[in-house]
């Protein structure tokens, strides 16, 4: 089984959609004030969907099924949030399948800084700009095969890369 990150979608920081924002200067006054207030209240929610691709190798004669996947998001080598994907996904040989993970975290639980610093971090994670940041996703899939369910014995790193501008 091969897993990779396809894309992120629906990236929001304190309810602000980040798709059209590349830097602090792109924020309107109201959004900048909302972020600053969220930081002072120590509640800066970041929500997004990470779309993974799962591919059963083309030379495999048998369909497999992803039954479950435990995952942990790491930012700057810090474990942040964990979750479980529990939707069964059929994995025909050679046909990549979308595995959408809904991820929510409070950035101020894991990082310090100004509203501008934390926006830069969020933009880096979203791949929209900011200084480079290390992002990793560790997962432990459970795959159903003709031999029965197989749980990976060790977590695998699906994504481990530096994101943001260089």
Q: What residue spans do the PLM features occupy?
A:
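Extracellular/lumenal and peripheral-membrane lipid-interaction modules
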Residues: 1-166
């Amino acid at each position: 089984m091969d897993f990779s990150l396809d894309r992120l979608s629906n990236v929001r920081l304190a309810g602000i959609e980040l798709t059209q924002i590349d830097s602090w200067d792109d924020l309107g006054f109201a959004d900048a004030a909302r972020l600053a207030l969220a930081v002072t209240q120590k509640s800066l929610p970041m929500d997004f969907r990470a779309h993974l691709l799962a591919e059963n190798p083309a030379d495999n004669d048998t369909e497999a099924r992803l039954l479950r996947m435990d995952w942990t998001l790491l930012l700057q080598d810090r474990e942040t949030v964990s979750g479980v994907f529990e939707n069964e996904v059929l994995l025909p040989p050679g046909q990549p399948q979308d595995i959408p993970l809904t991820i929510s975290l409070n950035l101020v639980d894991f990082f310090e800084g100004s509203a501008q610093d934390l926006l830069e971090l969020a933009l880096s994670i979203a791949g929209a700009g900011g200084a480079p940041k290390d992002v990793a996703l560790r997962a432990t899939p459970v795959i159903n095969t003709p031999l029965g369910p197989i749980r990976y014995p060790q977590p695998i790193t699906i994504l481990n890369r530096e994101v943001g501008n260089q």
